[in-house]
């Protein structure tokens, strides 16, 4: 089927660099091939620089941003866990939907779409639900373009609650200090 060229300017998918497209013409490497493992190690090291973390478990997920968020939630949440989720756009709302599908009890911290969520509201919610498994928020909400402040949420790291941040839109464009902000 002949396809016409497209210029993709949305948050994803996007047009790859010609070098990336050319790489598709090369023979595949198996996932246990020493060259593949070296490439994966290099990729993880570069990701650690972008995420500003020293965590050796920094790794890419082969899928959409929503697939990454879902992978995170299904590995962290069990039925009857509490998830506190900041919602000020489509992707905060999607977090709620995925958490509910995991069987979690969702505590929504809603803000008008297009306005940032006051981080103190999330901190106060965690204090009200001290056994919450996660506090989750989108760093830069794709649907509205609003940036939510994450640094104050580092206080959550002093509890047993995990801090989950969706940085699909912001990573690489806005500094994200995973270690400094104590993001799990």
Residue ranges and their predicted role:
Residues 3, 10, 42-43, 55, ...:
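Conserved PLP-enzyme active-site core in the AAT-like
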Residues 24-71, 97-100:
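Conserved N-terminal alpha-helix of the aminotransferase class I/II PLP-enzyme fold
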């Amino acid at each position: 089927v002949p396809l016409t060229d497209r210029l993709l300017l949305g948050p994803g998918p996007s047009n790859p660099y010609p070098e990336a497209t050319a790489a598709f013409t090369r023979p595949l490497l198996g996932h246990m091939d020493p060259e593949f493992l070296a490439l994966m190690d290099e990729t993880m090291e570069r990701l650690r620089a972008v995420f500003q973390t020293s965590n050796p478990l920094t790794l890419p997920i082969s899928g959409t941003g929503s697939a990454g968020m879902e992978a995170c939630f299904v590995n962290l949440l069990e039925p009857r866990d509490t998830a506190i989720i900041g919602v000020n756009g489509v992707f905060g709302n999607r977090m709620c939907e995925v958490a509910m599908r995991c069987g979690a009890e969702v505590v929504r911290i809603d803000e008008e779409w297009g306005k940032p969520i006051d981080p103190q509201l999330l901190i106060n919610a965690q204090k009200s639900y001290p056994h919450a498994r996660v506090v989750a928020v989108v760093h830069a909400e794709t649907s509205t373009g609003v940036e939510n402040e994450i640094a104050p949420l580092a206080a959550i790291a002093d509890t047993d609650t995990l801090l989950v941040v969706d940085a699909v839109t912001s990573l690489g464009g806005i500094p994200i200090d995973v270690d400094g902000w104590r993001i799990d």
